[in-house]
A protein has these predicted regions:
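Carbohydrate-binding/catalytic loop surfaces
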Residues: 139, 200-207, 288-296
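Structured C-terminal helix/loop/strand segments within mature extracytoplasmic catalytic/sensor domains
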Residues: 3-6, 10, 17-58, 169, ...
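Active-site-proximal helix/loop microenvironment
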Residues: 183-258
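Short, highly charged low-complexity linear segments
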Residues: 155-164, 185-190, 205-221, 302-313, ...
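Tryptophan-centered motif/residue detector
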Residues: 77, 96, 201-203, 268, ...
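Short alpha-helical linear motifs
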Residues: 137-142, 186-187, 214, 285-292, ...
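A short small-residue
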Residues: 77, 133-135, 226-229, 324-326
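Active-site-adjacent loops and short helices of periplasmic peptidoglycan-processing enzymes
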Residues: 25-201
Length: 360
């Protein structure tokens, strides 16, 4: 008790002294010139600013024409580098075929289980694994299997079969316009687009063996170069990274297809087998990617249409739409793949809380 009285007395005495001091008026405070002229400290950069700076650094540092866009589907903001450039899609355009087909299924025009027969004269050019299954009587399959081959294996013959199913390339373009997917172009289909870009005219032999490559190599280099440059100057399958990430975000949010068809397409994209060293090569444990790749023709050191677009999902469920499009580049293959991986890593790093350590 004695100690308590002593403490109380001290507090009372101190309070009286403080009151006495406070009663004495002090001169008004005036800021010095240095304080008046000193700028306020900038707030720490946010996730969007950090990601924008890194995306711009990556895009500007690549030897070629590059477009990159990232859209935070959860919060609605986006960053980009050259995001409005209209660049060749190549097989990225297979996404719009799938959306057109599934939209027709939603309307009741046909079903996933409907049968489609593919004959040798229906085959396409370049990568088409189902070609080996087409015998003298054709190959009987379903729309569901063609969609899986088109998205997951980037099978050109499967893609062409689905285009025929919905009414041709123009039907796909009508679907793109009808769903307000920006300025995305679909193009005339693989046969015409690839042969024209090579300086050739389509003929059925190009579906087999090395006939396409042999004829292309016989062309005078100047003719082939002129054809490829004409394609790059005005790609019939052009799209901008910003339009693509906007479309992917709308797909994720269920704005383009029925809930069943949306889930179906996203599941197909999760099983994509191409592009292991592109965006997917930059993932960390716990992150998921649903995507579609595209790859164009190569002439000497010039590579065209190297793309990967998709939806990156964080362990906490936040989703980012990402598009990396390399319209043309003389950078080595490894550098092109590294750019796509670096973009994925940049998104992941920007999502991570400040000071957090990446998982091992």
């Amino acid at each position: 008790m004695r100690r308590g009285r002593s403490l109380l007395g001290g507090l009372l005495i101190g309070g009286v002294a403080l009151a006495a001091v406070s009663a004495v008026p002090s001169p008004p405070w005036t800021p010095t010139a240095d304080l008046l002229s000193a700028p306020l400290p900038a707030p720490p950069p946010g996730q969007q600013d950090l990601l924008r700076a890194e995306i711009e650094r990556l895009g500007a540092g690549h030897d070629g024409e590059v477009g990159i866009a990232v859209l935070d589907v959860t919060n609605g903001w986006s960053v980009d580098y050259n995001g409005q450039a209209h660049l060749p899609q190549q097989s990225v355009s297979k996404l719009w075929v799938a959306i057109t087909v599934l939209g027709a299924i939603d309307r009741g025009d046909f079903k996933l289980s409907d049968t489609v027969v593919i004959h040798k004269e229906d085959l396409s050019v370049f990568h088409q694994p189902l070609r080996d299954r087409v015998g003298p009587g054709g190959y009987r399959t379903t729309i569901a299997r063609l969609l899986a081959a088109e998205i997951q294996q980037s099978d050109n013959a499967a893609n062409d079969a689905l285009i025929r199913q919905v009414g041709g390339p123009w039907a796909v373009q009508i679907a793109i316009v009808g769903k307000s997917l920006g300025e995305i172009r679909f193009g005339p289909g693989e046969r015409e687009m690839q042969t024209r870009a090579a300086g050739l005219t389509w003929k059925p032999e190009y579906s087999f063996g090395r006939a396409f490559w042999d004829d292309r190599e016989k062309l005078p280099p100047a003719r082939r170069r002129a054809a490829l440059e004409a394609y790059l100057a005005n790609p019939p399958d052009a799209a901008s990274p910003l339009d693509i990430v906007d479309t992917l975000a709308r797909l994720q949010q269920g704005e383009l297809l029925s809930p069943q068809s949306t889930a179906y397409l996203l599941d197909l994209m999760a099983g994509t087998q191409t592009g292991a060293t592109r965006l997917r090569g930059g993932l960390e444990p716990g992150w998921r990617l649903r995507h579609k790749t595209g790859t164009g023709q190569v002439m000497g050191a010039l590579a065209t249409g190297n793309n990967d677009v998709g939806l990156l999902t964080a362990p906490d469920g936040r989703v980012y739409a990402v598009a990396v499009m390399i319209g043309q580049s003389r950078a080595p293959f490894e550098a092109r793949q590294a750019l796509m991986q670096a973009v994925a890593r940049a998104v992941i790093a920007s999502h991570r809380p400040a000071g957090a350590v990446p998982p091992i």
